[in-house]
Amino acid sequence: DQDFYVSKSNEFAFKLLNSWPKWEKNFVNLIGEKFSGKTHLINIFLEKFKGIKIEANEINNEFLKKIKVFENIIIENFNDKIDENLLFTLLNIIDQDNKYLILTSKNPIVDHSFKLNDLNSRSKNFLLCNIEKPGDDLMFALILKNLSDRQISIDKKLVDFIIKRIDRSY
């Protein structure tokens, strides 16, 4: 938690996850590009509120049995390789047992074209939580942290110079 830098680009996601269980919906889709901090946020959430986490392509019937004792279920890296029938069953279990689901993905689940029509309508029930591209403040913090992790010190003016010219991605 202490080495997660909250900025304008990730503040909504950080606050939403920390406001559990006072969410509008039990289904949250945490959206962000690779390295945007989704997994870091999920790990902070799990440390605080407990739960079970699995990669989307690893969901199986055994996992569906395991979740019974958990209130919070995390599906990481949702993609088109997911077993739609298992996902549908999972959503039904979460709905019926009043559990919570956080699904991380690069793109909103609502933009996905499911073969199962019921999943297309269910995907509209997710609260979408987007991590935006990093602003100057976050880029500054990320650069300093990466350099510090490697025990490299650099003049802050040089970091400012880099920030003005760097690509806005993670």
Protein language model annotation of sequence segments:
Residues 66-86, 90, 97-106:
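Conserved P-loop NTPase "ATPase switch" module shared by AAA+ and STAND
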Residues 111-112, 126-138:
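Conserved AAA+ ATPase "SRH/arginine-finger" region at the nucleotide-binding site
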Residues 25-41:
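Walker A/P-loop nucleotide-binding motif
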Residues 1-12:
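Dynamic helix-loop-helix/coil hinge segments at AAA+ ATPase domain boundaries and subdomain interfaces
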Residues 153-165:
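Short conserved motifs of the RecA-like P-loop NTPase core
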Residues 141-152:
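Conserved AAA+ ATPase "sensor/coupling" helix adjacent to the nucleotide-binding pocket
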Residues 10-22:
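Pre-Walker A adenine-sensing motif
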Residues 109-124:
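Short regulatory helix/loop adjacent to the ATP-binding pocket of P-loop NTPases
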